[in-house]
Amino acid sequence: YQCGQGG
């Protein structure tokens, strides 16, 4: 899962 702020 990648949060969208640098992973």
Swiss-Prot record:
Keyword Metal-binding attached: no
Keyword Coiled coil on entry: no
Keyword list, A-Z: Antimicrobial, Fungicide
Listed transmembrane segments: none
Disulfide pairings: none
GO biological process: defense response to fungus; killing of cells of another organism
Further remark: Inhibits HIV-1 reverse transcriptase with an IC(50) of 10 uM.
Known function: Has antifungal activity against B.cinerea. Inhibits HIV-1 reverse transcriptase.
Designated name of the protein: Ascalin
Organism annotation: Allium cepa var. aggregatum (Shallot)
Lineage: Eukaryota, Viridiplantae, Streptophyta, Embryophyta, Tracheophyta
